[in-house]
């Protein structure tokens, strides 16, 4: 996901569009206001490189806060696994739309997360809080895959209804394939 964000920042600044960056978990960790100068590119890329992924998040609350703090209309891009309350995330994204922003979601999905393609017991470790859970994937695979498809379809449908672009990104795809899905 960091490479995707870096590529998007690069493309925006090379087109002389302003690009900024906000990283967050339970709170906003970093905000760099948008600028279109080429010199701004290094600052954004360094900040993206140094940002930490993981930790618990409260996406929906932070989306509302950000929507209120960004006064100039523009393009808002959310790169996330979207593992939070789906309805609250959509409400937060609609807040941006209400303020006149265009919104794109890049939903980051690992193929094994999508298919639960494991043969035996799996020990899951939550990257946000290190909780552990061991399960036999064969016992839950069918129900899990159905639930995951419903989860993704919820976002696709709600985004379509609210004029929000939704792009599912496979973590095993190369950067050019990921970008071509949207561009």
Kindly give the residue locations of the regions a language model identified:
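Exposed, interaction-prone extracellular/peripheral surfaces
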Residues: 2-183
């Amino acid at each position: 996901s960091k490479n995707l964000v870096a590529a998007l920042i690069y493309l925006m600044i090379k087109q002389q569009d302003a690009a900024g960056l906000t990283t967050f978990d339970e709170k906003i960790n970093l905000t760099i206001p948008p600028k279109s100068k080429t010199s701004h590119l290094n600052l954004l890329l360094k900040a993206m490189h140094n940002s930490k992924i993981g930790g618990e998040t409260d996406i929906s609350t932070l989306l509302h806060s950000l929507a209120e703090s960004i006064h100039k209309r523009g393009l808002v891009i959310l790169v996330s696994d979207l593992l939070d309350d789906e309805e609250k995330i959509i409400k937060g994204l609609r807040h941006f739309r209400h303020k006149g922003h265009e919104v794109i979601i890049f939903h980051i999905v690992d193929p094994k997360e999508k298919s639960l393609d494991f043969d035996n017991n799996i020990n899951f470790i939550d990257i946000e809080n290190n909780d552990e859970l061991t399960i036999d994937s064969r016992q839950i695979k069918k129900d899990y895959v159905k639930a995951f498809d419903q989860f993704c379809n919820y976002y696709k449908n709600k985004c379509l209804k609210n004029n929000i672009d939704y792009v599912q990104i496979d973590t095993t795809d190369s950067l050019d394939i990921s970008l071509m899905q949207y561009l």
